[in-house]
Amino acid sequence: KIEMVNAPLQALNEVCLLWQIDVDELWTRDQLIRMREMFLAEPERTAAFYWCHFFVGEDLAISTRHCYAQRPEKEWLRTWRYRPGMIWFSHAPPWLSLPGPKGWSIVSEAHAFSHAETEAAGLVFQHYAYATEEQVAFKERYYGYHGAVAEWERLNQARHAPLRLGDYLHWVQDETRVDRLDRLGIVPLARRDPATGEWRFAH
């Protein structure tokens, strides 16, 4: 994966913002514009960390922090001020590195926007990581989460919330809680059409 993520950098010959946006991560246009404005206003900033709304079902998301999928020491670093010559030293964690007189340094270790700063600006993205059965089936195969689909179905059939995620998904070993989107005040950016089963952007 290192070769894959480094390949596009060869085409970047000027200072710019570099974003990692996975296929299951949704942002709004206004969020991207706002983050750009913040980087322009503070030229010394090097990167940005974010919180996310982490979906574990069509209508369920994680409600706690400093837990599974919400560990601020490594999640979620998604934006960097890229300068020509930088390279990826690691894909996971995403370490973009800069050459210097004393060797290579990790860009995000100095002057990054914190989770609190980006959240205060409304920059919390929506991560549809386990929103559909198809996603869970893939992760069951890819990560070896035996029985993941059955566990996920039981989680999403539960009638009461909040719930302890580890009581349903066996690979979650901490006290992570999940709750309904409406109880969390989350307005989803994508919804499944109950008639067709197709997912559509809501905005």
Where are these regions (language model features)?
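Short beta-strand-to-loop acidic/aromatic patch adjacent to the donor-nucleotide binding site
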Residues: 15-26
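Catalytic-site signature of metal-activated, phosphate-bearing donor transferases
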Residues: 1-6, 28-203
